[in-house]
Structure formats: structure tokens, C-alpha cells
Amino acid sequence: MYMLAGFRALQGIGAGGLFSLALAILGDIVPPRARAKYQGYFLAVFGTSSVLGPVIGGTFAGQSSILGITGWRWVFLVNVPIGFIALVVVARTLNLPHSRREHRLDYLGAVFISVGLVPLLTVAEQGRTWGWGSGRSLACYVIGVVGIAAFVWTESRMGEDALIPVRFFRNRTFALTSVVAVVIGMGLFGGISALPLYLQIVRGATPTRSGLELIPLTLGIMLGSVISGQVISRTGRYKIFPVVGSALMIVGMVLLHFIGATTPYWQTGVCMLVFGLGLGNVLQPITLAVQNAMPPQDIGVATSSSTFFRQMGGALGVAIFLSVLFSTVGGNIKSAFDASAKTPAFQTAINDPAVQANPVNKPVLAALQGHGSIGGATINDTSFIQHLDKALARPFQVGFSTSMDLVFLVGAGVLVLGFVMLIFLPEIPLRTQSAMAAREPGSPVGGVPDDRR
């Protein structure tokens, strides 16, 4: 596991900038008003890939061996030819003029932001195991706060060479969307992280099938991104889309809060579609608003900063919301067993000789007789639930579903905060010049928005 984490970190060094860099390149070569359309296409493709990836990965993971190599290893190997093809295409087609500018690299800023965020992410994930007031948790709090304080101090001294120049936050749009990005990221990734768990643990779907069952979410993202991009390109108005989109995300998350262990899939699919429509209307216009509000020379840093804040919010959201899930699931499973124990069907099942003889059922039956804990072991391994007798499996599914409902409700609450902040998002007229054209000598300064707005 440590090797996996280390190599993923190495992979992240190269991959971390690809998403924001693609959006920054669009910002450089396409005027904001026309850019909305292309960013809509970009996010639609991204959403499609987000579903195809888990499906393909699940297919590989489900194979014991392919060409003499363990199936799950192909999840990583398949990226090599895809990355090579992308490298060749970019090298042959992306030929943009660029000017070199001497600047200092903000090594200290990169170190301090890592020192600040890693301990906070760690305690958000491990706090339920360590104890939120334990020595290790307190150490993470202190190191995290000191690291972030040192990062802010370093950025103020680095000026224009900072990872995130402090002057950016004097721009109202950038400052507001940075906070919104953290909040939306928390609600988005934190809430959605429970969906595959619901589909696999509660509904019993395989990893491949659960990826396919996320298609309504992807369809919503595609429709929301493309429609908002087309309308913004025609009207030049963008503020209404993230406001309406965040409202749809809240509605979708609240609807997901009401799904249960026996909810038909079509109802879950409708909830995901509503949430995806909202998400598609939020991500693209927010990026567009940031790029339009900043001077052309700052678009790259501003775009990557916005992506950074969203990813950090997402990482915190996943860690915090999964902590909520797993800290409550044990008690909810026990409550579900207490309720089921009173039903004739459950009593019939536990007294059935065939059920008692099945070795998969024996640990649960022993726990029911007081020889173990119900719910504790399921946190680390849930695969056995799908092999249990249906009557014994149902309380586990109900317990997980109840905890996931809480996660969706917390996610909706976080998204409400984002919705309120988006109401105050300034709407600056979209420029008709690309950033590249605006930087050319003789370009009218009117193409650059007022940095104070």
C-alpha cells in the first residue's frame, strides 16, 4: 500500500497540472464568449471518461490474468499507450507562440503548502481511528496550521513569483470563486464518493456494473456542460448557470438522502441525473468567470489555482464524509439488526439449518449470540455481505444505506453554503478577444477587465 501511495504521488507530480493546463490553453487561444462552448465540450468528454475509466478498470480487475499479467495491474498499464498517444498528438498539433520570462521558482511555497495540507488531510481520514483529540491528531492540527501560515507568509514575500500571488485575492471574482471551489469540491467529491459504495455494498453491484450505473450522473454532466456552454456563447451571460446549477446539486443531494436499501435503481438514476445537470452548469461557468475576470497574463495561474482549490476541497470532503460514514455505520448496522430480530422472517432464517450450516453465515450468527461484534469488521471488508443469506445481509445493507443518507444530507448542507456565495458572484461582460490577442502590442486595454471588480 505504501508503494502504491508513493507511486501515485509521483504520478500526481506530472498529472496534477494537465487538467488545469488544458483549460488555461483554451483561455489563451479562444475568446471568453466562444470559450464557454469549447469548455462545455471539454467537460462533457471529461465526464464520459470518468465513467468509462471505472468500467474499464473494473473489467480488468475482474480478470485473474491477461497475457500472463495479473488483471488489476492492467488498470495502470493501460494508461501507458493512452498517455503516449496523447503525447504524440500534443507534440504534433499544439504549436503556440510563447515568450520566456525570467522568474523565481517558489520552492518554499510548494513545500509549505504540502506541509500544511498533508497533515490536515491525514487527520481528516484517520481521526476516527486515532481519536479526534489524540496526540497524533493534535500534532496534525498544529503542523497543518503552521504549514498554512508559513505558506501565506511565503506567498506575500514572493510577489509575482508566488504559486498564488496575493494580489489575486483583491479581485472579487477570484476571491469568491476560490472559496466556492473549496465548498463545491467538498460537497461534490465528498457526496459522490458514497455513490459507488451505495451501488456496490447496498445494491450488490460489481465494480464494472456500478460504473455503468453511474451513467445517469455522467449524462447529466454532459448535458449541463454542453447546454450552458452553448447558451453562454450566444448570450454572453453566465452568472445564472452556477446559481441554478448549485441549486440543482442541492436538490439532487437531498433526493439521494432519501434513497434506501430497497429503492429501485431508476429512482437513484433520476437523483444522479439531477445532480449531474447541476454539476455541469457549475464547473464550466465558474472556470469561465475566473478567466474572464483576470488579466490575460494571469489566466494560467488563476485557472490552476481555481482547480487546486476545488481539488483540495474534494480531498477534504472525501476524507471528512467517509469519516462520517464509517463512524456511524457500526451503530446503524446494530440498530438494523435489533429491528430485524423482531421479524418472523429473520427468526426463520437464523433457525434454518441450511443457513446455520453455511460457513459464510457463521460469524454473523455467532455475533448475534453475543460472541463478537456486529458491524465492526464490515468497515474494513464488505465483500462477505453479498454472500450472506438475504435475511442476514439486509441489516448490513440498511445500516450502510442509513449512514450514506447522512453523508448525502451533510453534502447538501455544504452545497447550500456554495449556493449562497454564488448569488454574489459578479457578472463581468465577456471579452471578445482571446488572451493571446490581448497580449499583443497595440491591443485595446478595454479588453482587460477591471481587477478590482
List each language-model region with its residue ranges.
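MFS-fold secondary transporters
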Residues: 11, 90, 255-256, 275, ...
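Hydrophobic/small/kink-forming positions within alpha-helical transmembrane segments
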Residues: 47, 51, 55, 114, ...
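Helix-loop-helix hairpins in multi-pass membrane proteins, especially solute transporters
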Residues: 1-108, 135, 219
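Small-residue-rich alpha-helical segments with characteristic i,i+4
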Residues: 19-20, 36-48, 52, 62, ...
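Transmembrane core module of solute transporters
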Residues: 3-5, 108, 130-301, 317, ...
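C-terminal membrane-cytosol helix-exit motif in multi-pass small-molecule transporters
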Residues: 80-98, 114-126, 144-158, 418-427
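Interfacial helix-cap and linker-helix signal at transmembrane-aqueous boundaries
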Residues: 56-69, 124, 199-200, 231-232, ...
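Transmembrane-helix exit segments and adjacent C-terminal regions of multi-pass membrane proteins
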Residues: 85, 89, 98, 133, ...
